[in-house]
A protein has these predicted regions:
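Short strand->helix junction
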Residues: 200, 293-294, 548
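Conserved PLP-enzyme active-site core in the AAT-like
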Residues: 8-10, 22-30, 41-57, 64-66, ...
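Short active-site oxyanion
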Residues: 3-5, 190-192, 214-217
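Non-catalytic terminal extensions of PLP-dependent enzymes
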Residues: 2-5, 9-46, 50-165, 185, ...
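Short glycine-rich or small-residue beta-strand-to-loop segments that form or flank ligand, phosphate
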Residues: 193, 286-289, 539-544
């Protein structure tokens, strides 16, 4: 299939009207992402120096009209010279088409290229899927609307593996293998596996490949629920939980520095599995969130140096990053750029490509970097690993998902990948500067002073290359995370997080007035701006190379407008009309500051900020009573009962309980419901009843409406009499 156009200069357009059925555009009518060649004449050589053309490696074709013109200075940048005076137009366009076709073949990665060609063959289908290239949909008005909405190619590319031309996605052969091998090269992995049902499944592939009952898993308490499901519930491993930081604003921080001390870890192992405490490598697998949802980034080299000798493998769940190796100042946090030897742990990395990279939703990838331990007993070879992969992979894959992973790797290949992310970081820096300059209530989570001057006065280009502008200085008040070590963490520059007022920066205590982030998030949604998530007094926006200055300026303008509405104390119905009219019995007559005050006072009266911090502090961890796998078995055996959370304290949880987002389990299966956990979830219950329209999503806890209209929270616990 011919995807690319040909860009022609004004002079050339007067001579060439069409090229082998391709669309022709003027050189000033394109951003060069959709053209396969630029054609100019020998009097327009200044275009050879166009940075956009050179950055994409687009062929430049020069038509010779005047043999006396000296073009020697430009020859190293010119792909082809056509002597128009001695050739027919047909021969000329044929030469141009050859160049374009070669370029087109070079930019399409292996699987996507094969898929495009296969779709172009227009085969007569008698295999799955039953819609047969969309034709079934076309036989009904509803189906036709569905087909027209998505367009022809998405249906024609939805293929069956009955035809093996595209390779096998389960045993990794043919073009499917080529695509994954190419991605491994781009990401510096030994082997890469494309996963089509999300990083929740990718994580389970990794965990089920490595862990068995009785194995020790060093468990970052920030881990996504899928780590519990795959590592604890399905594999039956024994968890050693590491406490993590939360700041008073609600941001998710990293593992405390002292948790990486060898003697401390061995002490924790001794509590659960005394016979393994003194083993050379007591830990089968450590699972670390390389980057938290809110953008606390680990130094991977530091992690491996501190605990690597205790672990067979370290698994970095990189769902919320994956682009770090394309941003030079972040390279120390990339596990895949580490130099490793036989004494180091094997490295496994999962990445949610769909989150901030260029993949369709549900696309994920697993990177395996463990050739340095090949031959050792702890090594997991491809065949054993792929056995786990096939347990979780569908035998009916959606080929466009796989193709998007292939294309993502191609986009990140070479210098262009770094260029895209550098531009993204610079856009994000400028947006933070704009908030600092234009907003009076909101502030970005960045150090106030760097290199002796205010953060906003730094040079954007230099800041994008200097991690000091994003470093978490231990115990600094501006971030209020406690327990960090020197150089341990920094802020992901691509997580644009803002802090709303209401928490005193110096003390971490609630102030008299505040603006909970949930109110700002709903205001933005009312105005068609969709943030990623919010927590108590934080709101998060994800930055990708898709962002532009125009888009960020529009966001900042809406933030400024929100602050103006707060100052004017306008009626709530003007700020949040959907919530106001959806719950008018509650909010009739409210002004926006009244809503802010009521919600702020609600959180303050229950000290939710402190409860949230305690949930992830070892001192307040729920008691570990039962292995999570056994707790789940009891749940399956119907040995649980559903009780109000007001009566759950001290009872053994049979399900993980968590708010979503962020998907981090607060009470693990097999733990006793603690007072802290009960108080936290009961505060959420109260909020659902007292502040309708701002209901959070909670999993593992069931909200049931009572006869009096009160919505009460329940959880499954082990039956007392059992």
């Amino acid at each position: 299939m011919k995807h690319l156009k040909v860009a022609l200069s004004d002079s050339v357009q007067s001579k060439i009207k069409s090229i082998a059925g391709r669309t022709c555009v003027g050189v000033f009518e394109t951003d060069f992402t959709d053209v396969g060649a630029v054609v100019i004449d020998d009097g327009e050589l200044d275009l050879v120096n166009n940075n956009q053309i050179s950055s994409f490696g687009i062929p430049i074709i020069v038509l010779r009209l005047d043999a006396s013109r000296d073009i020697s200075l430009y020859e190293n940048r010119i792909t082809s010279i056509i002597e128009l005076l001695s050739m027919s137009i047909d021969d000329c366009t044929s030469e141009i088409e050859k160049v374009v076709a070669n370029y087109e073949a070079s930019i399409l990665p292996p699987f996507f290229r094969a898929l495009s060609d296969y779709v172009g063959d227009e085969n007569s289908q008698f295999d799955c899927p039953g819609h047969q290239g969309g034709q079934f949909f076309y036989k009904h008005p509803t189906g036709r609307a569905f087909y027209n909405f998505f367009g022809e190619n998405i249906f024609r590319a939805d293929l069956c593996n009955a035809d093996v031309k595209l390779g096998d996605l389960l045993i990794h052969e043919g073009y499917a293998y080529d695509a994954q091998a190419h991605a491994a090269k781009v990401y510096n992995a030994d082997k890469t596996y494309f996963v089509l049902n999300g990083t929740s499944s990718a994580n389970k592939v990794v965990l089920n490949a490595l862990l068995t009952p009785g194995d020790i898993i060093l468990y970052d308490r920030n881990n996504h629920k899928s780590i519990c499901h795959g590592g604890l519930v399905m594999s039956g491993a024994t968890p050693i939980y590491l406490e993590t930081a939360r700041n008073p604003f609600g941001s998710i921080g990293g593992i405390l520095d002292h948790c990486f001390d060898e003697s401390y870890i061995r002490q924790l192992v001794a509590e659960k599995s005394p016979e393994k405490a003194n083993a050379k490598r007591p830990i089968r697998l450590a699972v670390i969130q390389l980057g938290t949802y809110d953008g606390t980034i680990y130094n991977a080299r530091q992690v491996v140096d501190k605990i690597g000798h205790l672990c067979d493998y370290i698994f970095f769940d990189s769902a919320w990053v994956g682009y770090e190796q394309f941003i030079p100042m972040m390279k120390d946090c990339s596990p895949l750029l580490l130099e490793l030897d036989p004494n180091d742990p094997g490295i496994l990395v999962t990445q949610s490509v769909h989150k901030q990279q260029a993949g369709f939703s549900q696309t994920s990838q697993i990177h395996k970097k463990d050739s340095h331990i090949k031959g050792q007993e702890r090594y997991v070879d491809h065949k054993r690993f792929n056995n786990s992969f096939m347990m979780h992979a569908s035998t009916s894959p959606f080929y466009p998902l796989f193709a998007s992973l292939d294309v993502n790797a191609k986009i990140h290949e070479g210098e262009l990948g770094q260029t895209l992310w550098r531009e993204c970081v610079e856009v994000a820096i400028d947006a933070r500067k704009a908030v600092l300059k234009q907003c009076k209530y909101l502030r970005p989570l960045v150090p106030p002073i760097v290199h002796g001057k205010p953060w906003k006065e730094g040079n954007t280009h230099e800041m994008a290359c200097d991690v000091k502008y994003f470093a978490f200085e231990p115990e600094a008040k501006w971030h209020s995370f406690n327990g960090y070590g020197e150089g341990q963490y920094f802020i992901d520059p691509c997580k644009f997080q803002l802090i709303t007022p209401g928490i005193n920066v110096e003390t971490g205590e609630y102030e008299e007035f505040g603006i909970p982030a949930n109110i700002l998030a709903n205001y933005l949604r009312e105005n068609r701006i969709i943030p990623e998530k919010c927590d108590l007094n934080t709101i998060l926006f994800l930055m990708t190379p898709a962002e532009s200055k125009y888009k960020m300026d529009a966001l900042v303008a809406e933030l400024v407008r929100f602050e103006e509405l707060i100052d004017l104390d306008v009626p709530m119905e003007e700020v949040l009309p959907s919530i106001y009219y959806g719950h008018i019995d509650k909010y009739k007559g409210y002004h926006i500051r009244q809503l802010c005050q009521e919600m702020h006072d609600f959180y303050k009266s229950r000290n939710v900020s402190l409860l949230q911090q305690r949930l992830f502090s070892r001192e307040y961890f729920p008691d570990y009573v039962m292995n999570p796998q056994e707790a789940n078995f009891e749940f399956q055996r119907n040995k649980g009962e559903l009780v109000p959370l007001s009566e759950a304290e001290g009872r053994i949880a049979l399900e993980g309980a968590l708010p979503y987002p962020p998907g981090v389990i607060c009470v693990q299966p097999g733990e006793r419901w603690s007072k802290t956990a009960c108080d936290y979830f009961l505060a959420l219950e109260d909020g659902i009843n007292q502040l309708p329209g701002f209901t959070p999503e909670i999993q593992g806890v069931y909200i049931t409406e009572q006869s009096n209209g009160y919505k009460q929270a329940y959880g499954y616990v082990l039956k007392k009499e059992y």
